Amino acid sequence: MAKDTTGRMHVQVKTGGKRKLSSKLWLERQLNDPYVAQAKRDGYRSRATYKLIEIDDKYHLLKPGMTVVDLGAAPGGWSQIAARRVGAEAGKGKVIAIDLLEMGEVPGVTFTQMDFHAQDAPEKLRAMLGGRADVVMSDMAANTTGHRKTDQLRIVGLVELAAHFAGEVLKPGGSFLAKTFQSGADAELLAQLKRDYATVRHVKPAASRQDSSERYVLAMGFRGGEPAELL
């Protein structure tokens, strides 16, 4: 264990047995990530929770009484924040969450384990909603192949799928938030969002690792068909 340039203790993991270097580096990063440590102290399920907190604190997506859809919800950090901020824990708002993986119960959240790629997934989600949503948010990530262009197209395709669903279920004035990655492959997606929302912007929360190309596309003021402003 050594100190880094900020004076914090830095944990180093030895490579032993069958542990791969990539696994060692991932584990080291987790152990030395201040957001991971903070999430444990605050009782949040993942460091990603702070990304939504920062975005919502700035743009005020989540309000009491709202209905929210959380796509790719596991392990539940975003659902936790959404449930608290819309009042779902007290039965005032509603949070519908899905993921391909299992997710432990979150107070105020209705969760179903399903593959969003499945043909019947949108229909099942609409039935769970029982009406329109105020916010559709997605922290889904596509499986990577290691081939940069292929991975970019997969990620954009996943966001396009989420955006299409949002266009089917959002109330007028609703918002769409989705994880994406910086690339030149999302021009068509942005053009569609500009037609459907009043404002479209990219945001990179402080909790997003600075060495990552991860960012979020935030579309607000759902209206469909009218030109929007890209910020």
Swiss-Prot record:
Annotated catalysed reactions: uridine(2552) in 23S rRNA + S-adenosyl-L-methionine = 2'-O-methyluridine(2552) in 23S rRNA + S-adenosyl-L-homocysteine + H(+)
MF annotations from Gene Ontology: rRNA (uridine-2'-O-)-methyltransferase activity
EC number(s) given by UniProt: 2.1.1.166
Main location: cytoplasm
This protein's record includes keyword Transferase: yes
Keywords: Cytoplasm, Methyltransferase, rRNA processing, S-adenosyl-L-methionine, Transferase
GO cellular component terms, A-Z: cytoplasm
Active site (catalytic residues): 179
Superkingdom field: Bacteria
Positions that bind S-adenosyl-L-methionine: 76, 78, 99, 115, 139
Location in or out of the cell: Cytoplasm
Family named by the database record: Belongs to the class I-like SAM-binding methyltransferase superfamily. RNA methyltransferase RlmE family.
Known function: Specifically methylates the uridine in position 2552 of 23S rRNA at the 2'-O position of the ribose in the fully assembled 50S ribosomal subunit.
Protein name per Swiss-Prot or TrEMBL: Ribosomal RNA large subunit methyltransferase E
Organism of provenance: Bradyrhizobium sp. (strain BTAi1 / ATCC BAA-1182)
